[in-house]
Amino acid sequence: MRFEHENLPQRIXFG
């Protein structure tokens, strides 16, 4: 998982 460029809003949702 090296795509934390647009994974900011998804990270909250996912995590």
From Swiss-Prot:
GO molecular function, one term: maleylacetate reductase activity
Transmembrane domains' residue ranges: none
Reactions mediated catalytically: 3-oxoadipate + NAD(+) = maleylacetate + NADH + H(+); 3-oxoadipate + NADP(+) = maleylacetate + NADPH + H(+)
Keyword Cell membrane part of the UniProt annotation: no
Pathway in which this enzyme or protein is active: Aromatic compound metabolism; 3-chlorocatechol degradation
EC number(s) given by UniProt: 1.3.1.32
Record GO biological process: catabolic process
Alphabetized UniProt keyword annotations: Aromatic hydrocarbons catabolism, NAD, Oxidoreductase
Family: Belongs to the iron-containing alcohol dehydrogenase family.
Identification of the protein by name: Putative maleylacetate reductase 2
